[in-house]
From Swiss-Prot:
Its EC number is 4.2.3.5. Homotetramer. It comes from Clostridium tetani (strain Massachusetts / E88). GO terms for biological process: amino acid biosynthetic process; aromatic amino acid family biosynthetic process; chorismate biosynthetic process. Its cofactor is FMNH2. This is Chorismate synthase. PANTHER family: CHORISMATE SYNTHASE (PTHR21085:SF0).
Length: 386
C-alpha cells in the first residue's frame, strides 16, 4: 500500500511541447507566494556556464492556473505552467505526421532512447527523448521554489554549490556564511575559489571543443531542520532514503553521499559524531553522518554530495545500432549542454526543498500556513524538555 503524504505533485509536458506543467496538492492555505522569487529560481537554473543553445531561446516564467487567489494560496490544488518558446518550431515534428524514414531509430548510449523505444513501442525514439529530457527540471524547480518560500518562513534553508567538475575540486565552505554564499551564487560555475573557477571554465571549454561532455559533484546543505524528521519505524520512512529517492530521480544523478559517508579511512571512534550539551541544546562537534542518524534528522545541517554523470548527448562519435535495420552505426547528436552540473545544483536545491517540506507536513499536518508555524514553533520550543 502506498504511503499517504500530505504533500504531493505530478508534472507533465514534453521538452518541445507547448508547456511544462505541474499540479501540487497539499500546500497550506493563506501563504503569500512571491512569484518573482520563483522566476528568479528559474533564471538561476538557466544562466549557468556550459549551457547549450536552448537556453538562448527559452525565457522561463511561471504561470499559476489554479490554487491562488491573487498571490495567496487557498488550500486547493495548485496548477503551474511554464510555456516553451521553442514549441512552434517543433509542431510538425511532434504532430504525429512524421514519415517512417523521418522517425528516430538510432539510440544514444547513456540516454533513455533504447529502453524507451522497447518499453513503449511507439517506433520513434523522439517520444522518449521528449520526456526524458532535462527540460522537465524547469517545472520541478518551480515546484521546489514554492516550497523553499514556505520553509524559509519556518526557519529552514536549502543551499548548494558545485564541488567538482570532472577531477577538479573546489573548497568546502560554510554555505550559510552570507558573504561566501553570495560569492558562490555570483560565480559562473557556482564555486568559491576564483582560481578553481578558471580551471572549471577551461575544462568545460576543452570538452566543448572535443565534442565531449563532463560531469561533476554538487554539495548541498539544509539548515534549520529540527530533530525528529523521518522515522526508523519502517524502511520507507527514513529521511535519508526519502531524500535519496527524490535526488536519484534527477536526470544524470548516479550517486549520493550523506556527510562523510564515502570516507572509508575513518574508524568508528572518529566517524561517530560526539554528542555535547550546551545552553539547553544538543550539539555535535562534527557532522560525518550528514545530519541524519538511523533515518531521522538529528538537528545538525543535512549535508549531501550528489554525483552527476556526463550528459549522454555528445558530438563525438561512439558506436550504437540503428534499430531499423539492426546494423552498427555511430551516434546522432541531439542539441544539449556541455555540462549539467551547475544547473543541477539549482534543481537539486528545489528537489530537496520539496522533500523536506513534504516530511515537515507529514510530521506537522497543517491545512493553513499559520497553523504550521504555530505547530513547528511549539515543537522547537519543547522538544528538548522531554
Amino acid at each position: 500500500m502506498e504511503r499517504y503524504t500530505m504533500l504531493r505533485f505530478l508534472d507533465a509536458g514534453e521538452s518541445h511541447g507547448k508547456a511544462m506543467m505541474s499540479i501540487i496538492d497539499g500546500i497550506p492555505s493563506n501563504f503569500k507566494v512571491d512569484i518573482d522569487f520563483i522566476n528568479n529560481e528559474l533564471k538561476r537554473r538557466q544562466k549557468c556556464y556550459g549551457r547549450g543553445g536552448r537556453m538562448k531561446i527559452e525565457k522561463d516564467k511561471i504561470q499559476f492556473l489554479s490554487g491562488l487567489r491573487g498571490t495567496m494560496t487557498t488550500g486547493n490544488p495548485i496548477t503551474m505552467a511554464i510555456y516553451n518558446n521553442d514549441s512552434p518550431n517543433w509542431e510538425k515534428i511532434l504532430s504525429g505526421e512524421v514519415k517512417k524514414d523521418e522517425k528516430i531509430t538510432i539510440p544514444r548510449p547513456g540516454h533513455g532512447d533504447l529502453v524507451g523505444y522497447f518499453k513503449y513501442g511507439t517506433g520513434d525514439i523522439r517520444d522518449s527523448i521528449e520526456r526524458t529530457s532535462a527540460r522537465e527540471t524547469s517545472i520541478r524547480t518551480a515546484v521546489g521554489a514554492l516550497c523553499k518560500q514556505i520553509l524559509k518562513g519556518i526557519g529552514i534553508e536549502v543551499r548548494s554549490k558545485v564541488y567538482s567538475i570532472g577531477n577538479l575540486f573546489d573548497e568546502k565552505v560554510d554555505l550559510f556564511d552570507q558573504c561566501k554564499y553570495k560569492k558562490i551564487d555570483n560565480s559562473l560555475l557556482r564555486c568559491y575559489n576564483e582560481e578553481v573557477e578558471k580551471s572549471f571554465v577551461k575544462k568545460i571549454d576543452i570538452c566543448r571543443e572535443q565534442g565531449e561532455t563532463i560531469g561533476g559533484t554538487v554539495f548541498l546543505s539544509v539548515r534549520g531542520v529540527p530533530i525528529g524528521l523521518g522515522s526508523y519505524s519502517q524502511w520507507d520512512r527514513k529521511l535519508d532514503a526519502l531524500l535519496s529517492y527524490a535526488i536519484m530521480s534527477l536526470q544524470g544523478v548516479k550517486a549520493i553521499e550523506f556527510g562523510n559517508g564515502m570516507n572509508l579511512n575513518l574508524r568508528g571512534s572518529t566517524f561517530n559524531d560526539e554528542i555535547l550539551y550546551e545552553k539547553g541544546k544538543f550539539k555535535r562537534p562534527t557532522n560525518n553522518c550528514g545530519g541524519i542518524e538511523s533515518g531521522v534528522s538529528n538537528g545538525e545541517n543535512i549535508e549531501m554530495k550528489v554525483y552527476i554523470k556526463p550528459i549522454p548527448s555528445i558530438k563525438k562519435n561512439i558506436r550504437t545500432v540503428n534499430l531499423r535495420n539492426r546494423k552498427e552505426t555511430t551516434t546522432r547528436y541531439e542539441r544539449s549542454d556541455v555540462s549539467a552540473v551547475v544547473p543541477a545544483s539549482i534543481v537539486l536545491e528545489n528537489i530537496v526543498a520539496f522533500e523536506i517540506l513534504k516530511e515537515i507536513l507529514n510530521k506537522f499536518p497543517s491545512d493553513e500556513y499559520y497553523e504550521l508555524k504555530r505547530n513547528i514553533s511549539h515543537y522547537r520550543g519543547t522538544i528538548y524538555l522531554r
